[in-house]
UniProtKB/Swiss-Prot annotation:
EC number annotated for this UniProt entry: 2.5.1.-
Additional observations: The gene is not located within a recognizable secondary metabolic gene cluster.
Function, as annotated: Prenyltransferase that attaches isoprenoid moieties to carbon atoms of aromatic substrates in an enzyme-catalyzed Friedel-Crafts reaction. Shows specificity for dimethylallyl diphosphate (DMAPP) and does not accept geranyl diphosphate (GPP) or isopentenyl diphosphate (IPP). Prenylates the artificial substrate 2,7-dihydroxynaphthalene (2,7-DHN), as well as dihydrophenazine-1-carboxylic acid at a lower level.
The family this protein is said to belong to: Belongs to the aromatic prenyltransferase family.
Keywords: Prenyltransferase, Transferase
Domain of life: Eukaryota
Organism: Aspergillus terreus (strain NIH 2624 / FGSC A1156)
Protein name in UniProt: Aromatic prenyltransferase
Family annotation (InterPro entries): Aro_prenylTrfase, Prenyltransferase_CloQ, PrenylTrfase-like_sf
Gene giving rise to this polypeptide: ptf
Amino acid sequence: MIQQVQQAVFDPERFLVDIEETCRAIGAPYSQEKTLKVLEGFQASFARGAVLWRITNRPGDALNYRFYERVSIDAVSCAVEAKLFQPNHPLSELIVSWTALYPGAAQQSCDFDAEQGFSKIWVYLGDMRPLSDILSAPHVPLSIRKHATTFYNLGLELVRHVAADFTSNTINIYFRVQGLLTLERARSLVRLSDPAYLLECGEVEEMRRLLNPVGFTFAVTMDYSTGDIKRVGIYALKLAPGTYPAMDERLKATRAIPLEKQAYILLSQGVLMAKEVAAAFPVPSETAAVNRPREVDVEVGVGVASFMFQPTTPIAPTVDVRDNVVVAVFHAVESP
């Protein structure tokens, strides 16, 4: 189902109201001071791009957001100029190295936290890239490179995204894994972060229900200083209608937001509201709108779910409402 919708211009004051109301609805921490610094530092990107929101079913977890624009930016320089981190930060040097691997193809963008402000820079590499390129880039520490054999033995050879989280001093590598997620394969992948944990058949069945049998995205989060694997994640992309994960009470809390605000739960600052929402989607509170002063294609029923595993928290699938997990993904196109 495709709709053409003319979108409103980004309004920072409206955004501040929306983010505070959403944090209040889900019980997420919020700092207006940090949020203002983000909006000031990336003013042009927020004006050009869609604003995507991310929440999880973990009580007290953060509300994250990002801008999504189809142009290449120097996110590192923007963050330094805005004094969001110091020049020559080790993680920023790593991001620059990864970006330089594929000139003209790699694209940088950022993730932000409603409480912490600036949190992460990630790089879309433009295509599937060999793991050897990623690990051999300048500024990749030996403690990270030492995992190469383990990754290859698990069939983790192709990388599409990388990221660096400045709040946790970690890096993420996002692999494309070919084929079906079997019980043994899932257990092998999860053991990277928690060797003692044994996935149950039912847990894998729930993930497999959402995963494309052709393949899936698998992420590894490592401490930049020590190389320790802190977390792994299995992502289900392009969810078909009717196959969405169950939403717990925290996620359903967004229903308390007035109807005209509900479109902001995933993407912000649009005019796909009220009757347009009701006409386009069966459940208005699980919809999204996009901030672009131009037309957009709305593809209903495309989304992302993720299952995170880390030894420091109870191991359980996590519903991750990110980049349209529930209903839609938006592709911006220029108006004629």
